[in-house]
């Protein structure tokens, strides 16, 4: 089922690329230089894990590479994502934490995602984006938190890019996103808001 969802997500994203290119205005790319972004995010978990790790957050670094004469950019991203327990954690929960006892309030599940994807500007500075890649559990005892120390991860979102700095070459992106690290027992997923501060590299 998760593979079907990922394929559906890819089809939707490719359809958006095709539609955006068909409606492309040649003068649009003048404010889209190569950019390096530094981001922060905050959200809440969804699915079964939300009963144990209710809050989520993270920091990220992203490289945005605009395609010439196109409203599409290629994204490369990495960072640190964490889920914080809100009221205790039962080690017997669906494969998480087997044989290691019980986790208490404030316990943190930590991951490093490495992803690539596309960012599309269908209308002016409004954008949609989607990424996929690998998520690495970096807790000292990864089996306390996951079945898979390394797992597939995907995310998608939409937002608005606010111009900043000289000629608007820098920007601040504000977006709403969904992220999912599917695995047996439910995995880790979240809905959150993200702010990325982008700096033009040329």
Q: What do these predicted ranges mean?
A:
Residues 67-71, 120-126, 162-166, 199-201:
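Outer-membrane beta-barrel strand-turn architecture
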Residues 44-51, 79-111, 136-150, 172-174, ...:
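Flexible, solvent-exposed loop segments that connect beta-strands
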Residues 1-27, 195:
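Bacterial Sec-dependent N-terminal signal peptides
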Residues 122, 127, 131-141:
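Internal catalytic-core helix/loop-beta-alpha segment
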Residues 36-40, 74-78, 116-118, 128-132, ...:
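Membrane-embedded beta-strand positions of outer-membrane beta-barrel proteins
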Residues 36, 55-61, 110-116, 134, ...:
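Hydrophobic, lipid-facing positions within transmembrane beta-strands of outer-membrane proteins
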Residues 21-81, 188-192, 198-202:
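Short glycine/proline- and aromatic-enriched beta-strand/turn motifs that initiate or cap beta-hairpins
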Residues 24, 31, 154-202:
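Predominantly the C-terminal beta-signal and adjacent terminal strand-loop region
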């Amino acid at each position: 089922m998760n593979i079907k969802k990922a394929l559906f997500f890819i089809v939707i994203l490719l359809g958006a690329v095709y539609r955006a290119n068909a409606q492309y205005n040649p003068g649009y790319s003048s404010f889209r230089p190569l950019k390096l972004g530094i981001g922060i995010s905050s959200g809440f978990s969804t699915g079964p894990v939300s009963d144990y790790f209710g809050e989520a957050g993270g920091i990220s670094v992203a490289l945005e590479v605009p395609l010439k004469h196109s409203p599409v950019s290629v994204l490369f991203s990495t960072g640190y994502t964490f889920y914080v327990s809100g009221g205790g954690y039962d080690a017997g929960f669906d494969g998480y934490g087997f044989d290691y006892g019980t986790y208490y309030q404030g316990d943190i599940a930590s991951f490093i995602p490495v992803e690539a994807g596309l960012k599309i500007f269908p209308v002016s500075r409004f954008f949609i984006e989607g990424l996929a890649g690998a998520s690495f559990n970096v807790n000292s005892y990864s089996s306390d938190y996951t079945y898979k120390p390394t797992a597939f991860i995907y995310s998608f979102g939409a937002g608005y890019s606010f111009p900043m700095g000289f000629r608007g070459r820098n920007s601040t992106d504000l977006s709403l996103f969904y992220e999912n690290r599917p695995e047996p027992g439910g995995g880790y997923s979240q809905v959150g808001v993200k702010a990325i501060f982008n700096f033009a590299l040329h």
